[in-house]
Amino acid sequence: MIDTIISGLVHGNVYALVAVGISLIFGVTGVVNFAQGSIVGFGAMLGWWFISVLGWPWWLALLAVAAASALIGWVINLTTVRPLIKAPPIAALLATFAASMVLDNLSQILFRADTREYPAPLPTDNLPVGGVRLGTSDAVAFGFTLAAMAALWAWLRFGRDGLAVRATAADPDAARQMGVPVTRVQNLSFLLASCLGGVGGIFFGMYAGVISPYSASFTGTVGFIAAAVGGLGSIAGAVAGGFVIGLLESLGIYQFGGGFRDLFIFGAFLLVLLLRPHGLFGSRHAVVSEPMTGTFLGAGRPIRLAWWHWLLLALVAGLAVPLLGGPVLSSVGTQVAIYAIIAVPMTLLAGSTGQISLGQAAPVAIGAYASALLVMRLGLPFLLALLLAGVVAAVLATVVTLPIWKLDGHYVSMATLALGYIVLSVIRSWDAVTKGAYGLSGIPSPEVFGLPLLVAEDHYQFDLVVLGITLFVIFRLRASHLGTVLVSVGSDEVAARSLGLHTRGYKVLTYAIAAFFAGLAGALLAHQYNYLDPTVFTVQMSVLVLTIVVLGGMNSPFGAVLGALALVGLPEALRLAPDVRILLYGIVVIAIIRFLPQGLWTRRA
């Protein structure tokens, strides 16, 4: 047990370094910097390259990684945060998430995605402590963290620039009027935070012994969780949150096994969000309650199509593509249609009500496994299983997320992100039902009214019908009285509540609708590919769906179809590698948010 606690403290030490950087940036800019985790991952891989490939001593590699990470943080601030500092929260949130995608996949392209041994420039088991052997590397990591925290505290308390940071965090406008160089202070916060993140990545690699771009980046994500648990904007809370998460992770693995790690980490995070959203040490007003989208991403009006436009599109999509493109183009079309079915209802959730879900892969996974199991275990017909999959996804996702809709702002995004990891953890761990990491194989192909859908052209045309129904339902909802109410909830929730609207209920309803169609898409995916495993439903799927919606226009259902065509169809048709695709997605999101925030299929209001 002692070695488990010490292991938790060592992990928590790294998480604390990452969390401090996240809290520092949030305190100064009010931005939840999702890219901080990727800086940790990139710093870890850069340290491996300096030590293993170039043969540098560890202290020189540490300094080089600190400098390189600081530079990366400065670039992220310059390109994705500073230009959007006056925009609604969704803008910078999505931009930093996109920067995270770019950095993660750039790391995989540069260093390769495989797992490799991390160099051990310092002894790892030469210090006996209470029957457990620690290493000089652990002592150096602890010492660095303590020294960094003490120096940061003293600097913020007594240093001139530190006082400027505190003034900017308290009120940037007032600080600017008093002569504080707010822009320089914001740059400084990114430099310091990124430096801490990169160094934390090296310490993680030294302790873990083996590393890959994904594992290092995930460590950064857990550091973000630690910052939120401790309280965004609180340095002391970030340190405490890091050690709490580290201990919880180690004790959970010790008691239940490594398969439950994500369940413990993100389950605890979700619990803290529900019981004390501002964190253990954070201010109750740290994350402001305001519309996430405002008029920034929702300013455009969707371009309307005449009836004959729809007829022409239906003929081209339904007949020309399978006849002229054959099975290859039809296979691409099925993927486009499935992602469009997920994305179109998101225009209600994100566009109308202003709620950003970073875990939409969760209801997709629930629907996929529900449909596959209903057909394989209970022998239900495909169409009935398809509908039930949507219902199961809507009910389960809504029940699990029901408490989070009382939250505001960034909290909803963070909670849905946690939900995505929790669902994946349950799928991986529930071997008796889901077969865990091995997945479900031999899922029957769809059969509609006695007609089996065996070839790609059949799958594509059926998916197209489901997409058409999805578009019809969402267009009708947007044009109805309910659609008007949802827009009022997203535009100004306080005003909507003052008019007697039960805003939380409308958010829940909108999420249930989006989850229902996501479940349908998951069922289609399961039966058309005949195989499922947890790696299909990663956070990258959720990010891709959100990217599709942003590209097409938050308020444009047909824009979501075009977004799916551009971001799913074109890369698939061009046979781009997965890493290159996600890198492209990140760049597209940043460009759209910066230069065309209303999306492609909209006109300015």
Q: What residue spans do the PLM features occupy?
A:
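Cytosolic-side transmembrane-helix boundaries in multi-pass membrane proteins
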Residues: V18, L110, D114, A170-Q177, ...
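Single transmembrane alpha-helix segments in multi-pass membrane proteins
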Residues: I2-I51, V75-A91, T183-R184, L188, ...
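Transmembrane helix-bundle core of multi-pass membrane transporters
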Residues: P83-L84, P89-F158, V185, G209, ...
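Hydrophobic core of alpha-helical transmembrane segments in multi-pass integral membrane proteins
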Residues: A68, F142-L152, L273, H309-L323, ...
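Helix-loop-helix "hairpin" substructures at the membrane interface of multi-pass membrane proteins
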Residues: G12, R133-I211, I235-A240, L305-A306, ...
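Membrane-interfacial amphipathic/re-entrant helices at transmembrane-helix boundaries
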Residues: M1-V18, L46, V53-A61, A87-L93, ...
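Alpha-helical transmembrane segments within multi-pass membrane transporters and channels
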Residues: I22, G55-A99, L106, A240-I245, ...
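Transmembrane alpha-helical segments in multi-pass inner-membrane proteins
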Residues: Y15-V20, G55-A67, N187-L275, P345, ...
